[in-house]
A protein has these predicted regions:
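Compositionally biased low-complexity segments, especially N-terminal hydrophobic helices
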Residues: 14-16, 58-61
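Long, histidine/aromatic-enriched segments associated with O2/redox biology
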Residues: 3-8, 32, 37-56, 63-451
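N-terminal secretory signal peptides
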Residues: 1-33
Length: 451
């Protein structure tokens, strides 16, 4: 919930849902191509090969922005000016993992990024990792793909890669020849009031965000990238997420979080190109940061909700803490879900209808110098703790142009004055990563950093 722009703005005209781009043969239910089916098409010539190319590549304009798939197509293009998985319509499932780089050799790190790029190109198209996949390699060697997604399609998988501060330096010493290349905006996040961070759930040199509509597809992707990185990286932390807590397109409905409220009503959308340029895409403040063109900064926060306490809170108090009705998501000042909150409207006794310490007021752009962010978080649950309380909450993910202006001030204010954040939430994990622009065909993730 923290950092969530609950304060809604009136929506522009609802964009029509994208039309179907692929109709026809499918060896899987629902009219979608399986991984084996894609290989079959790839092996054909002439018109069939052209169909496969159109299915996998889309047109050049669409690919340049790494957009969502057309209609029911399970493939999201990997290449583009921006990485997929940022403005892509949010999928249903998440598996995100941070890695520590264990190799000390620059050439091995570069080769890993090339190998990851090659694997990501295959996985996001619904193909196995490696030349021989899960079953076509030699019996005396481990398979190049783990195989649990053999019978599944791409599932709208996106893989988004980022670099943490630890990639650039460790204990004050530059790593991998990257002295002076750490972006100024890639700061060490400050300690916020109420933080109870677990170091084992925080930080990391590299991060990979895998989002898909099928959880097995997302897990398969992270598992295979970790396998490819064996000996060069090790997993520092990972998190599974379900039930997106924001929409990134006007074609999507507003989801609910584990408090039962609609979440992310005023989130930035892919249709808001001007606002994305202003609030999401990074701007290089110096020549050394030119490799971040088309990129962004990923803020990750694991936020545990005090579920049992919340469940004993009255409906009226819950709505006052949020500043919205639980049913429709309308602001307490009146209207519908997308009605702009009226923070000056008063009720009986002259009290504001939207409380001064409510989440919607504290997170609203008018209270934060007009700052917006693109949220892409997910609900999570990790069983229960030792006293029988659910370990559940929000895995908060936001993409911003600069965390110094677009995350830290808002989070600091909310950690001090948002009663919801103070009494019902606990931050247990944290990370900040520089997400470079999209990889071009023939290139690799973050290649500009190593040029």
């Amino acid at each position: 919930m923290t950092g969530c722009p609950f304060g809604a703005r009136p929506p522009e005209a609802q964009a029509e849902a994208p039309t179907d781009a692929l109709k026809g043969e499918s060896p899987t239910p629902g009219g979608r191509l399986s991984r084996r089916g894609l290989f079959g098409i790839a092996g054909l010539g002439g018109a069939a090969a052209g169909l496969a190319a159109g299915f996998l590549g889309h047109d050049a304009v669409a690919a340049s922005a790494a957009p969502a798939p057309d209609g029911d197509s399970p493939v999201v293009p990997f290449h583009g000016d921006h990485q997929a998985g940022i403005t892509t319509p949010a999928q249903d499932r998440l598996h995100i993992a941070a890695f520590d780089v264990t190799t000390t050799k620059r050439e091995e790190l570069i080769q890993l990024l090339k190998d990851w790029t090659q694997a990501a190109e295959a996985l996001t198209e619904g193909r196995p990792a490696g030349a021989t996949g899960a079953v076509d390699g030699p019996y005396g060697a481990p398979p190049e793909d783990t195989g649990e997604a053999l019978d599944l399609n791409a599932g709208k998988l996106t893989l988004t890669f980022g670099f943490g501060a630890g990639l650039f330096e460790q204990d004050g010493v530059a790593r991998f020849g990257l002295d002076g290349r750490r972006p100024e905006a890639l700061i060490d996040l400050p300690h916020f009031p109420g933080d109870d961070l677990d170091p084992a759930r925080s930080g990391g040199d590299l991060v990979v965000q895998a989002c898909a509509d099928d959880p097995q597809v997302a897990v398969h992707a992270i598992r295979n990238l970790a396998r490819i990185g064996f000996g060069k990286v090790r997993v520092r932390w990972s998190q599974l997420g379900f039930g997106r807590t924001s929409s990134t397109s006007r074609a999507q409905h507003t989801p609910r979080n584990l408090f039962g409220f609609k979440d992310g009503t005023a989130n930035l959308k892919v249709e808001d190109e001007r606002l994305l340029d202003q609030h999401v895409w990074a701007r290089a403040s110096r020549p050394e940061d030119a490799w971040m063109a088309g990129g962004s900064y990923l803020v990750a926060r694991r936020i545990r909700m005090h579920i049992e306490t919340w469940d004993r809170t009255s409906l009226g108090e819950q709505e006052g803490l949020i500043g919205r009705t639980k049913g429709t998501g309308a602001p307490l000042s009146g209207g519908e879900e997308f009605t702009e909150p009226d923070f000056n409207r008063q009720g009986k006794g002259g009290k504001p209808l939207i409380p001064l310490d409510s989440h919607v007021r504290m997170a609203h752009p008018t209270q934060n110098n007009g700052v917006r962010m693109l949220r892409r978080g997910y609900n999570y649950t990790d069983g229960s703790d030792g006293v029988g309380h659910l370990d559940a909450g929000l895995f908060f993910i936001a993409f911003v142009t600069d965390p110094r202006t677009h995350y830290v001030p808002m989070q600091m204010a909310m950690a001090k004055g948002d009663t919801l954040a103070v009494e019902y939430l606990k931050h247990t994990g944290s990370g900040l990563f520089a997400v470079p622009g999209g990889a071009k065909p023939g290139g690799f993730i973050g290649d500009g950093l190593f040029a």
